[in-house]
Amino acid sequence: AYSCTTSELKAVYDVKDSSKHNALSAYRNFANETITGTDNKEYQTDFFGMLDTFIAQKPLGVVCDFNGSSRYQSIDREFFKERKINFYSINDFEIAHEIIPEAENLVHVAAEMERLHKEGHNEVVLGYMPDCDGDRGNIVYWDEKQKKAVILKAQEVFSLSVLAELTYSIWQHSDEKDFKPAVVVNCPTSMRINEIASALGAQVFRAEVGEANVVNLAREKREQGYTVRILGEGSNGGTITYPAAVRDPLNTIFALLKLLMMRECGLYEMWCTKSGQKYNPDFTLSDIIASLPVYTTTGVSEPRAVLKVKTTDHTKLKAAFQKAFEADWKKKSGELKNKYGIIDWEAVITKGTVETCGVKDFSTSEKGGLKIIFKDKDSKPIAFIWMRGSGTEPVFRIMCDVKGNKVDMEKALLEWETELIKKADK
């Protein structure tokens, strides 16, 4: 084993402060590039000047529940202050509750936002909670109509980020002759992303679950001439904004701020025009959220989204699932048509960066993702069920996505999927 000398150890400690300073400075510069979409300093100055002007007219505040996250030691506090955005935080130094930034753990930052409003800090409109290593964070916002803090679901956070960064990319590059906007997501990301992208004239490409798969597919698509400004795994809300290759809650927050601050001929107005919705110039974040396509989606952290299985051979399990599914389809097709308007289905698999549609043999997905897309009489997708086995534990991750506010339909389809997997696992 190697042991260092006292002088070598001292040399490390002697440069720790300067090294930390340089690291934070590099991160701050990179955040500026990621948020603005360019390394051009003059453009960055103009962009943040526009933000400063908006904030001078309408002050903004952000609250963070660090929950002992490493982000407390990062640039967040100073970065917001540089932009004249009031910043508040709780649980700076300690892990005070569960660490996954999902709805059940965002109640703490929501409560702090409501406390701040009671004390007169009405400028606080956004809140976030990062995970321990600081790359993931989900959002709480202040609903002016309900006068309370509202927790956004992971798929809603990602949808807002996609809306913001797609429209921003179009705003930046639409006059370029070869501009081809695209979004890259993982297999279980809600179909609401397809609706947003379609309205904005963008393509959606899907990879297998796993941040590396999504990042690699985005690189492949850029090599093919697409502009992929935004990518990520909607199932966990994580936003990856190019040129970054990892999630960052700062990019998520500033995506939402872009929507709010760019008013005249801005991003939200572009979205309303292209999606055929009425534009109100005096809009709030609540209005933007209300304009999003409505879907009912299983939350990734819900107990019903994890199913224990005995079969370790995923290929065998999926072959048995197909047999059970096709047998049940013959029995249930009439009921599915009458209750939910489901006329047909299509199997889709994802393995690494490759998505294959119209699959006839479910088992070819092996350890990858398997999705059954349900279609209506016009052959349009209206729901899907999805599954993928864990590589580290004997469980299957499952979920359902349904177009519209249809809680009963989502529940019924997920229960059906659960029954079929259990039958296949015998």
PLM features: residue spans?
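Gly/Ser/Thr-enriched, mixed-charge loops and adjacent short helices
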Residues: 1-120
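Phosphate/diphosphate-binding loops
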Residues: 105-129, 162, 191, 210-212, ...
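Ser/Thr/Gly-rich flexible loops in soluble cytosolic domains mediating phosphotransfer, phosphorylation
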Residues: 1-23, 152-177, 265, 269
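Core alpha/beta catalytic barrel or barrel-like domain that forms the active/cofactor pocket
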Residues: 2-4, 89, 129-136, 231-232
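Structural signal for hydrophobic packing residues in well-ordered secondary-structure cores
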Residues: 1, 23, 27-42, 51-52, ...
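Short Gly/Thr/Asp-enriched flexible loops that form oxyanion-binding sites at enzyme active sites
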Residues: 1, 75-77, 135-156, 193
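Phosphate-binding and adjacent anionic-ligand microenvironments
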Residues: 126, 130-132, 142, 147-150, ...
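Short, acidic/turn-prone active-site loops that include or flank metal/cofactor-
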Residues: 90-95, 154-158, 208-213
